[in-house]
UniProtKB/Swiss-Prot annotation:
Subunit structure of this chain's protein: Heterotetramer of two alpha and two beta subunits.
Name the record gives this protein: Succinate--CoA ligase [ADP-forming] subunit beta
Keyword Transferase: no
InterPro entries, sorted: ATP-grasp, ATP-grasp_succ-CoA_synth-type, ATP_grasp_subdomain_1, Succ-CoA_synthase_bsu_CS, SUCC_ACL_C, Succ_CoA_ligase-like_bsu, Succinyl-CoA_synth-like
Family affiliation: Belongs to the succinate/malate CoA ligase beta subunit family.
EC number from the UniProt entry: 6.2.1.5
Chain sites annotated for binding Mg(2+): N198, D212
Length: 388
């Protein structure tokens, strides 16, 4: 779960990380009032869950209240398209209005989950305000990565070493060490998968300040992060993803045309891999879970079919806790309810498989059965692309 910049900065402020003075505005009038508090000279930032706002016109430096209001009229209640949003863009429901802070130099600092090592990793660079991956490619010596031993944690001597790498000394080194340790505490206590400051700036007054902030919370930890869950902005999610979340269905929209309905995250990922191996493009990741009942399968199938990009469906079910005949009944009910004419290829294994197969073969719907995953993936790809 991603946080908005203003939410991330609010969180950082609690942990003693310096941030610019700012105000949240949800209307043109509130934007004008916020700008007036800074005598009209401020930065107006669109709040969306994507980067690239500056180049897309979502961040503007203004010198008057009228300019701030004009920016608000252009951005609020509209969608902002950036390099990271796709063509559909993201809805702008609020603006962060901040003081203008003169900056002497910019750095980069983040803590993220290194999934390859199964550990947290600190990433730092004396070059901030830019894409860290681009910096790592062009000048790898300008990027320091520190893998954190979970039994040791991030210690003060680690923080001091990173501060030296950033080129800081004296009071700024001490301030940077404090920021690094506070950021690590925030990461752990909020079950975050990413906390990022880009840029971490040294102001012309010689102070350290987080000019931009990014935080992502582990979705699996939201049950114990009640406040973070309350900060969820559903306007930043695809409508079908919101609907799926309310039904406890794991659904992620993708760019392909083959809808996938699977039980179990591992099996779902294997299904996507097999589809790609066979030349197909999945339209979604959809995991109904191991204990789904017929009603949940019906809702999952309806969500899948409401994506206009879906041209065919691949169903891959392992009947352990779930019975294949109940899944078959759910598929048939859902397809009949929505009047589905799309080709559907089903592969099932496990409890009451033969009964499920019999039910599907008796229906008049465009459903075909395959015994293996590779055969099922190949079948749906060939139905949609006969030349494949």
């Amino acid at each position: 779960m991603k946080l908005h910049e203003y939410q991330a900065k609010q969180l950082f402020h609690r942990y003693g990380i310096p941030i610019p003075e700012g105000r949240l505005a949800r209307s043109v009038e509130e934007t004008g009032q916020a700008a007036r508090a800074f005598a009209g000279r401020c930065v107006v930032k669109a709040q969306i869950h994507a980067g690239g706002r500056g180049k897309a016109g979502g961040v503007a430096r203004v010198n008057s209240v009228d300019q701030a209001r004009n920016i608000a009229q252009r951005l609020l209640q509209h969608t902002l398209v950036t390099a990271q949003t796709g063509d559909q863009g993201l809805y702008v429901g609020s603006l962060l209005v901040e003081e203008i802070v003169p900056v002497a130099r910019e750095m980069y600092l983040s803590l993220t989950l290194d999934r390859a090592n199964g550990r947290y990793c600190l990433i730092a660079s004396p070059d901030g305000g830019v894409d860290i991956e681009q910096t790592a490619r062009k000048t790898p010596e300008r990027v320091r990565r520190l893998t954190i031993d979970p039994l040791v944690g991030l210690r003060a001597f680690h923080a001091r070493d990173i501060a030296r790498f950033l080129g800081l000394d004296g009071p700024l080194s001490a301030a940077a060490s404090k920021v690094i340790l506070s950021l690590y505490r925030c990461l752990l206590e909020k079950d975050a998968s990413l906390v990022e400051i880009n840029p971490l700036a040294v102001t012309e007054e010689g102070r350290l300040m987080a000019m931009d902030a990014k935080v992502s919370i582990d979705d699996s930890a939201l049950f114990r992060q009640k406040e973070m869950l309350e900060w969820l902005d559903e306007s930043q999610l695809a409508p079908l993803e919101v609907r799926a979340a309310h039904s406890d269905i794991a659904y992620i929209k993708m760019d392909g045309c083959i809808g996938c309905l699977v039980n179990g995250a591992g099996l779902a990922m294997a299904t996507l891999d097999m589809l790609s191996e066979c030349g197909g493009q999945p339209a979604n990741f959809l995991d109904v879970g191991g204990g789904a009942d017929q009603d949940k399968v019906v809702e999952a199938f309806r969500i899948l079919l409401e994506d206009p990009a879906v041209e065919g469906v691949l169903v891959n079910i392992f009947g352990g806790i779930m019975r294949c005949d109940l899944i078959a009944q759910g598929l048939i009910a859902a397809a009949e309810q929505v009047g589905c004419q799309l080709p559907i290829v089903v592969r099932m294994a496990g409890a009451r498989r033969d009964e499920g197969k019999h039910l599907l073969q008796q229906t008049q719907l465009n459903i075909s059965w395959q015994d293996g995953l590779a055969a099922a993936a190949t079948a749906i790809v060939r139905q949609l692309s006969p030349s494949a």
